[in-house]
């Protein structure tokens, strides 16, 4: 257990109500500083000892800083290749020893084909292959609408990479894939984009589940809502059981843990 100190002069920037609430909940030292106890909780994965499955391997698209890749590997599936259009993102991944075995590439998904991965797949010889990717969210994000306050056609947005993603999927024919995006992709204004996803999954012979997830419900100290389209060549009925909840939910369900807070 450690103590985080908020010095007295901080209160010059808060309301009296906020100050009273903090003084009520936390200890105060002789100098008038608030002391907040907290436990170090590691969200680092660099030293995680993962036993990877031999039969399934993954290729990552739109890899960014590796969020989906981390989740994939924590689930025991080695990411053998990652791709992102931004060099800074790829350099970040290269410096993360959690992906020391992964081939990280700078590239534009619209300019590559499934043949790009022929040599890698011959070398790795996975019995089953999955692809994970979160196409750029800007065409579907609420934030973009708030900035411009204009109606947009997400299917005409050049940043919409749903079809290029499905082109790679159609060429590689993975046993399954993940398509992640922001919750607002399900807004009626983006119905055409969602229909494109469903139509392509069905045309390629995939069964699928749709999961709507709030990261706070699973022990992450932030409210981040995301949508996951999970597709498989076999029947799939994916569900998630939340592990955390607010005070009212925890009282109703003793199996739930209270939401994590950054201050904790």
Indicate residue ranges for each PLM-predicted region:
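S-adenosyl-L-methionine-dependent DNA methyltransferase catalytic core
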Residues: 1-80, 200-203, 226-264
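Core alpha/beta nucleotide-donor-binding catalytic domains of modification enzymes
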Residues: 21-173, 183-187, 192-195
